[in-house]
Amino acid sequence: VTANWHQGNAAEDGSPTRGWLVGHFIDPSEGVRSSKDVEVKWFTHPAGDRRAEWTSDDQRTTLVLLVHGKFRIDLTESSATMTQQGDYVMWGPGIDHSWEAIEESTVMTVRWPSQT
């Protein structure tokens, strides 16, 4: 029987999955962290870290929340730079994105649904 609750550290628990804590890709033996409904990521990006490649035809809704640092999101519709703790960018299905950590940045990402 898998546990229906979990306590941990986001940086440690997400380490094997590039920061992802919750999602369909988490082994069901991890219990409540395995979900087809939502994905949650916590990650600290070093300054200059970037994903220059754009996502392609992503059909999920995404929220990226800045915990600290300076982080830019480029969207097919616009660009946004988050500079203050609590700044966020959210976009819906069909909008592609890339990103860059202008300074060392910790961000929390929430996407849904998890499996498309």
Regions found by a protein language model. Name each.
Residues V1-A47, A52-W54:
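A short, N-terminal "cap"/entry segment at the start of jelly-roll beta-barrel domains
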Residues Q59, S79, I95, E103-E104:
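A generic "binding-loop/recognition-motif" signal
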Residues E77-G94:
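Short acidic-glycine-tyrosine-enriched beta hairpin
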Residues Q59-R72, T76:
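Glycine- and acidic-residue-biased ligand/ion/polar-headgroup-sensing regions
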Residues A52-E53, I73-D74, W91, D96-I102:
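Short beta-strand His + acidic residue motifs that chelate non-heme Fe in jelly-roll/DSBH
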Residues F43, M90, E103-T116:
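A short hydrophobic beta-strand segment most commonly corresponding to one strand
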